[in-house]
Amino acid sequence: ITYGSFRGFYRAIKEKFPQYDVGIIHFDAHLDVEDEYLNMPEVWHGNVFRKLIEDGYLDGGNLYTIGPRGVIYSQWFKYVQKKGINLYTSNQIKLKGIKNIINEIIEKNKNKKIKFYITFDIDCLDSSYIFGTGTPQCNGLTPYEADEALRTLKKLEVAGMDIVELNPKLDDSHSSFVTACELLYHFLALGYNGGEKD
């Protein structure tokens, strides 16, 4: 979803705001910069950001990945370093606080002309809150931290958002679906408008 959506976002921003660059705020338990893997298609959920970078839609320095944890293979980490991707691990979030992390991102971009796209992989949230995803991970964000991050990100020029990796069929309680809906509702209720004047 993110690969196609962001390509459309990129084209729309470049057409309407040619003076602006584009960036992504990426909430995820994983880096999603893998290369080829077994018999996976050319674009799959594990390589989305590598493809966007390699296909010329995204500068690695404008990608902010928030919440990765667990095993990070050396070749993926080397790719992150090579492309200048901004990485904020789950452990860093626990030590610094999500609001401080987001404020760091805002500070880095305060003098730049960038329209941001938020992509929220639901497995960024801790597995004790989210059951309806194919790759749950412990030690993730709480729903409160996610909501606080969205509230704080309003200081940036955010013009688009998606929520991915949600599979309600894996959660009989439907709590994962409700949580995802709440996050999207809060995003809309906060009145994000890409920095446009009301």
Walk through the language-model features, giving the residues of each.
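Conserved alpha-helical scaffold segments that buttress catalytic/binding sites
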Residues: 1-198
